Amino acid sequence: MRNYDLSPLLRQWIGFDKLASSMQGSQEPIDFPPYNIEKKDDNHYRITLALAGFRQSDLDIEVEGPRLTVKGSPAPSEKAVEYLHQGLVFKPFTLSFTLAEHLHVSDAHFENGLLHIDLVRDVPEALQPQRIAIGGGRPALNQQSAEDAS
């Protein structure tokens, strides 16, 4: 089994570095369903899963703490089908993602066989970087304390 180090690629992603390490440690590669993780900007992400043949009622999305879990269970076919070639996969799956702090699901929709899960990072204002203005007309602290002493 090949072991790829994805950490340089995932450093800029919010919360997905744990996913890469858990994928690297597992014995079975995650090959179903195929998915993309898109970064729209520093605070907006989208996970897209390709789920051809699934219906919206076959899918379940849960968030428990920092873990986002997507489950799919296709309804069993009522007809017995004899396949000459079967390239489409209709099997149950569970796919989990570890979300970073302050990252939450803002929307999920299923369209044309694609499940889109939108994520938003809402950092509280107290934790956001703050700009400090550099004053030009105020006296320095040493001068001010010398004036106060006299």
Swiss-Prot record:
It is found in: Cytoplasm. Coiled coil: none annotated. It holds the Pfam family HSP20. Residues 26-137 form the sHSP domain. Its main location: cytoplasm. Disulfide bonds: none annotated. One of its GO terms (cellular component) is cytoplasm. One of its GO terms (biological process) is protein stabilization. It comes from the Bacteria. Belongs to the small heat shock protein (HSP20) family. Homodimer. Forms homomultimers of about 100-150 subunits at optimal growth temperatures. Conformation changes to oligomers at high temperatures or high ionic concentrations. The decrease in size of the multimers is accompanied by an increase in chaperone activity. This is Small heat shock protein IbpB. It comes from Pectobacterium atrosepticum (strain SCRI 1043 / ATCC BAA-672). The lineage of its organism: Bacteria, Pseudomonadati, Pseudomonadota, Gammaproteobacteria, Enterobacterales. The gene is ibpB.
